[in-house]
């Protein structure tokens, strides 16, 4: 049994155990309750000082560059690219999706005009005139389309064309504040980085949030468990989409009370959200295929049957806001994205065009690769059609095209660099058919094994 030591003292103030209310022991040291209270007061004062420094705009501005010679925003109406010019640039890289390209072209054009209008109004010195001026509010955009339909490609192509900062973020990594994952403010940090940490320039930018359907709440009905990566993220994004002063940690990660934050006004930032929304077609089909309970006349039954005939691939053209609510987006979130564009599912003909027509078409890319080995590569029209047919079967959109061509070209790119006498090479339909043809052999157990036919 340990003996009681009456001479124990606080290692910081030196008071004995009899002079204090509580003495806490550590590995070879002791601290009293009075010293603990003093430490808490010091930490509280430091916290208040840091908060005062964070909320002081001049101190924040000193840490940020104000001039960016590499980028400029055209704020004169005559220098703003017209919607036809923007769509023409998109046509060079993206095949089809005419409706989505028109919506994006008009939205970007109006974004430029809002920036020009704001600069014009800010330059006026007459306060009475400013108070009566019309305020132009932004219209955020929601892109809905199946995987591989070109949502991300449209955003990346816009980024090449625009003179404003453009950032792409992934919604799948976001969580509600206080949980493991990224805060929504990290989206703004990406825009800041694209602007070389220029706050004024970042406040005129455009942000594309990909995989936005992944933050849909897990159930249409309220749950007692907290949905930190679904509805919680939607709630956190509301003010940012609408327009607010957001505090962004310059180093990324979670906001810390002892770290300075950069303040960004999101009222002039255009947000474009995109997602595949798998299962949304079924919700639309179910709504359109509803029929009444009880007795119905023949004419009523014919009306119901007519609605049921709608092709599931075209059902998203009849999309309503209630369908998005049933999918898992809260009404407040939908209300802050008033413009909705539905991308078409890619057909076989569209996939053929994607292989050959765009500026960076896959066929052109592989021709360039083999030209570096002094080999001229060509594709027969039938082979392009066969590749498109195989991609259509995989149901992953344009992404399947690269996978198929990589598999098709593997042996060719492996042997051709060593064949000095080969100067031309042609991809035929037979080569494509031999690569992907298969037959099913039944095993005694009843299972199936797929064996590729030899060429």
Curated annotation (Swiss-Prot):
Keywords carried by this UniProt record: ATP-binding, Chaperone, Metal-binding, Nucleotide-binding, Zinc
PROSITE patterns: CLPX_ZB
One Gene Ontology molecular-function label: zinc ion binding
SUPFAM superfamilies with a match to the protein in the record: Glucocorticoid receptor-like (DNA-binding domain) (SSF57716), P-loop containing nucleoside triphosphate hydrolases (SSF52540)
CDD domains: RecA-like_ClpX (cd19497)
Family annotation (Pfam families): AAA_2, ClpB_D2-small, zf-C4_ClpX
One GO term of the biological process aspect: proteolysis involved in protein catabolic process
InterPro entries for this protein: AAA+_ATPase, ATP-dep_Clp_protease_ClpX, ATPase_AAA_core, Clp_ATPase_C, Clp_protease_ATP-bd_su_ClpX, ClpX_bact, P-loop_NTPase, Znf_CppX_C4
Residues spanning the membrane: none
Residues annotated as binding Zn(2+): 10, 13, 32, 35
Key word Oxidoreductase present: no
Domain ClpX-type ZB, residue spans: 1-51
Chain positions recorded as ATP binding sites: 146-153
Region (Disordered) residue spans: 51-75
Gene Ontology cellular component list: HslUV protease complex
Family according to the record: Belongs to the ClpX chaperone family.
Quaternary structure and partners: Component of the ClpX-ClpP complex. Forms a hexameric ring that, in the presence of ATP, binds to fourteen ClpP subunits assembled into a disk-like structure with a central cavity, resembling the structure of eukaryotic proteasomes.
Function as written in the Swiss-Prot or TrEMBL entry: ATP-dependent specificity component of the Clp protease. It directs the protease to specific substrates. Can perform chaperone functions in the absence of ClpP.
Protein name: ATP-dependent Clp protease ATP-binding subunit ClpX
Source organism (scientific name): Prochlorococcus marinus (strain AS9601)
